[in-house]
A protein has these predicted regions:
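DNA-binding patch around the recognition helix
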Residues: 1, 24, 69, 73-101
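Short, Lys/Arg-enriched segments at the junction into DNA-binding effector domains
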Residues: 1-43, 47, 96
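Conserved catalytic core of two-component sensor histidine kinases
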Residues: 26, 59, 66
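A short, conserved alpha-helix in the catalytic core of glycosyltransferases
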Residues: 31-37, 66-73
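Alpha-helix N-cap and coil->helix boundary residues
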Residues: 44-48, 60, 64, 80-83, ...
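A short acidic, leucine-rich amphipathic alpha-helix
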Residues: 48-50, 72
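Short helix-coil junctions and helix-kink-helix linkers
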Residues: 52-57
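Short, flexible micro-motifs
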Residues: 58, 63, 93-95
Length: 101
């Protein structure tokens, strides 16, 4: 389980909670947010995410990642100012966690 301010991601039972309430989230979105949040502030390219979340045998379009990120943002937008799902232009995505200092 990965926890941040107002967010809990439990991959064991595929449960995403925002403010303590379960948010309906498809399996790949769960796996994607879990992967990003488990590696805070690390930038992943679309290809890395496809390999690491979808698997090496995935032959779909890399824009699949964009669609899943968009859907996650719709669920998580404005929940906390301590973390955010960020686009790193020209590179990929990261789960950005603010420094507590």
């Amino acid at each position: 389980e990965v926890k941040y301010d107002k967010l809990s991601i439990n991959l064991t039972n595929y449960e995403l909670k925002v403010n303590g309430k379960v948010v309906d989230t498809p399996p790949k979105e769960m796996e994607l947010i879990y992967h990003l949040a488990s590696n805070p502030n690390r930038v992943f390219t679309r290809d890395q995410l496809l390999d690491e979340v979808w698997g090496f045998d995935y032959y779909g379009d890399s824009r699949t990642v964009d669609v899943h990120v968009k859907r996650l943002r719709e669920k998580l937008e404005g929940v906390s100012d301590q973390w955010a799902l960020k686009t790193v232009w020209g590179v990929g995505y990261k789960f950005e966690v603010k420094d507590k200092n």
